[in-house]
Amino acid sequence: MKTLNKLMLSFLLTFAVLQAFSYDFQEGDLRYTIISANPPEVSVSGHANGTSAQGALSIPETVLHDGITYTVTEIGVRAFQYCQALTGDIVIPNSVRRIEQEAFEGCSGFTGTLTLSNQLTYIGESAFLGNNLYPMHLHGNLLLPESLDVIGSQAFLGCSGFTGLLVLPQCSYIGQEAFRSCSGFTGDIVIPTSITHLEDGIFAHCTGFDGTIVLHDNIENIGNGTFRYCSGLTGELVIPESITLIDVMAFYDCESLTGTLNIPSSVVEIGASAFAYCYGFTGELVIPESINEIPHGAFKECVGLTSVVIPNTVTKIGQLPPDCLNKEGAFEGCTGLTGTLQLPENLIRIGGMAFKDCTGLTGELVFPPSLQRIDAEAFKGCTGLTGDLVLPVSVSIIEPDAFRGCTGFSSLQIKNAVSDVNIMRKAFYGCTGMHDIEFTEKVSHIGSNAFAETGWEADQPDGILMLLDWCLGYKGNASNLALQLPETTRGIADCAFTGNTNIKSLSIPDDCPMTKISDSAFYGCNKLAGLLTIPNGIKTIGQSAFERCSKIKNLELAPSVETLDYFAFDYCTGLESITSWAETPPLVKYSFYDVNTDIPLKVPCGTMEAYQNNSQWSAFTNISEVPFKLTVSVDHPDHGTCSIVKHGDCDNPESIVQATPNNGHEFAFWAIDGDIVSYDQTYTFNLEHSTALKAHFDFESVGENDEYAFAVYPNPGKDVLNIRTGLKDAWVEVYDLNGRMIYRQEITENDTAINTTNWSEGTYVWKVFSGVSTGSTTLAETGKWIKE
């Protein structure tokens, strides 16, 4: 069937070619096809010598054949296509009513004028088309007869030699790009009243027009690029109220148009880059309420505009489509816009580069509560914006460079977000005036250099840069750095330590709430050496997280690790062993390129076969099983100690741990992830999974005379926060990391239980004050508590 279809297609193509060059008779140098016997009419099918024809072309009004006089009424399809040696003028006799498609395409030898029939009604597609290989050299004025009804697509494309378009008749149709690149035309463009749709690119690249555009009240649509690059057109652009669509690039680079741009309320859609680079428009631009989206590039570099009024009907400004090649912001580079920018109440999205380099905008930038995302470079370089930058709770994405170089902002607030917030690469880079930063615990990702070169960064002392429990990197140039992240670390920004050659060791606490080591976090830290332990709680090791850390010798992956993203440990050529405590082999995405696969890979009891059958882990040839990992810790080092008495193995899993309280304390319980598993001080159990046990201690009985006995437990916890103290006349306060007090209660008993069921996961700060009744309050104790 496929073969038959191919044969049929080949036959049809061959038939079409033969049909295009077939003829009925030849008289002189021309061939003719009879198109009517009564009255006798013929079409000129071509030259007797085909494309080798030379010299002047003479087309008669009539031709005598076999005693019959035929009227020549048509120039046929491709009749003289690519006859490059034909020279002189083209004179179409007045008998001709139609010039079919591609009739004179590529006839680059004609250097004279074009005279059209005064009875001509139809000019087909590409009839006089010229291109780079076969340019058209016709010159002089192009006089189109009043009889003309249809001008096909690309009919005169590239006829740059014409110097004037004398009459644009009352056609019913002018096709796409009909006069594109006719750069010699001068004067005005007057659209006939018979045209209701201006097709795409009709006058694109007609740079010679130096008059005005006259649009009548019957026009409904202005097509894609209709007047694109008509840079010489002048005067005020009057858009009639009949128009509903101004399509993509309709007036792109019409740089000499002047006056106020008035868009009527009839317009329901403005295409991307429709008025980009129209430098001459001035004054206030009012977007009609009929518009609900301002596309990307719509008014780029309309530098003469001084203000813009955007109605509340607009929900998106400048959203870039996926894989957009022509990336232009809606108001990018509109340097003439001044004063405060009033954004519409129902705005959902501010697109890429929407207000980039609008340096004249001043004052505070106030966002509507409906806003959900701010795309890349949306306000990049808006140096005149000042005050506090407060993002609404609905914002979930701040894309790369969104506020880069906005030097006037003094602070940033991202509070009480209703969903996870993604702050991407260099979002606030170079905001040198931004000294205070507050954001919600719902921040789920911080891209590389998101807060680099800000006032906040400049204010920080040398050391680890921590912003509300997010690690952004290291400030200073300490050598042989033993990098130890805080226990409260919730995340590491992308590329936080990329290329830091001073780090010699890395310690990430087991109890920190972080679940991912971000992309390229330690890329190229080629002094990082020895044992690298990925602690429990980490689920993902990001792309290139430790790529080219060539001096790491031993790698230990916690039981929680699920994914090693692309290139995570590529070129870690110094690795001598890997231990993975995960019972299910983590997903590996080509994460060990150029790592010696003969090194030992140690996996938990009973999992060797799973690793050997895994498509990525099976590359390692030396896989063996080891006992499950067992670790013990205490709730507070001042409360007591603990130890492993017996560590079970693959054959005998029985294990024993022991807790020893310090003076003034007593053992309470053993817990795993906050869940109590035993009240036995010496706890015996079977080690069947990698296990992290924590010993919890209480104070010995607290009496009324105990001036200062204190405990907060469990920590981390889930549904309850217990505070034990001997203080009287006291109260407790709990704050989130934005400094907002979320709980306050007077302490009346030795033990105070706070229900935390409805609290969000994260880190909280608790404070206990004494001296309530005296009015001389004192902070007695403070610390952090983690809700899991």
Predicted regions and their residues:
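Structural signature of tandem-repeat unit edges
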Residues: A37-P39, A53-E74, Q84-R98, S108-Y122, ...
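Acidic, Ser/Thr
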Residues: H47-N49, V657-G664, R724-G726
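Consensus positions within tandem repeat domains that build extended binding/scaffold surfaces
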Residues: V77-R78, E100-E105, G124-L129, G152-L157, ...
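Residue-level detector of functionally pivotal "anchor" positions at catalytic/ligand-binding pockets or at interdomain
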Residues: P627-S633, H696-Y713
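Surface-exposed interfaces of beta-sheet-rich extracellular modules
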Residues: P653-Q681
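C-terminal outer-membrane/trafficking sorting elements
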Residues: H665, N705-Y713, G717-E788
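Solvent-exposed segments in extracellular or luminal domains encompassing
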Residues: T682-T691, A753-T756
